[in-house]
Amino acid sequence: MKGELSLHICGCRGSRSVFGPEFTEFGGQTTCFVLKKANYALVLDCGTGLDNARDLLAGCSAVDVVVTHWHYDHVMGLMDWSVFPAGAKLRFFVSSDAYNLSFDALSQLFRHPFWPVDPTLRVVRQPVKWECPVSLRPGVKVTFLPAPHPDGSSVLDLSVFDKHICVLCDFEHNREFPEEILHNCDLLLYDGMYTDDEYPAHVNWGHSTWQEGCRLANRVEPARLLITHHEPRRTDSQLRALEQEAKKLFPAAAFARAGMKITF
């Protein structure tokens, strides 16, 4: 497949959307990332940031969607299915645990009298087993690993056209996690919702700290570290200041911003 591979940050706010002039640089819409090459797109989660993917998906003939879990901030973008090209081949991939909940969860979320549109999912009819690489198409593989998070979530270990990308979003740091899968990845996206000082009040909430992300990066040495899932009330100025502190701990660190594009 010709063309460059790029990652687009369509939403990187954690837990809920926020609005206002103090949230314009990093964005207030919730998790949605898009990997794109030529006329193919791989969508990672469908938070409210999915609407920002509309133009990216417009020319795609094939779209794969990976859903880490069914919490609102990762699926509310599915309120408007017109974001997906009408003629594109659309497939959804979820973990074996989430698969069993997929139809029930979405039918409960998008149903009368709360929402007038009943979305029809074209979900792959085979659940994806934990820790078993699945080929989505030639050159694209994903491995789901269980993430420490209330109700469960997934770490994504992705091989996309020879690039190794790991997504630890909605992830609480855990010594038992197999860090070896992350070694020397091209990009590590990490849940940095809290600071180390804030974390003790949020143990078992299913999220980590940007400092833990930097410590992990120093152990596994990714080419780039991107901190995401920003705390809802964290302003642009606060995030900029934390980003500078993160660079002191791991020079290749940055904080995700809505509209950011990373080319591999």
Language model regions located:
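DG-centered beta-turn motif at the end of beta-strands
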Residues: 168-170
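Binuclear metal-dependent hydrolase catalytic cores
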Residues: 1-166, 176-177, 240-264
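Cap/insert and terminal regions of metallo-dependent hydrolase folds
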Residues: 172-259
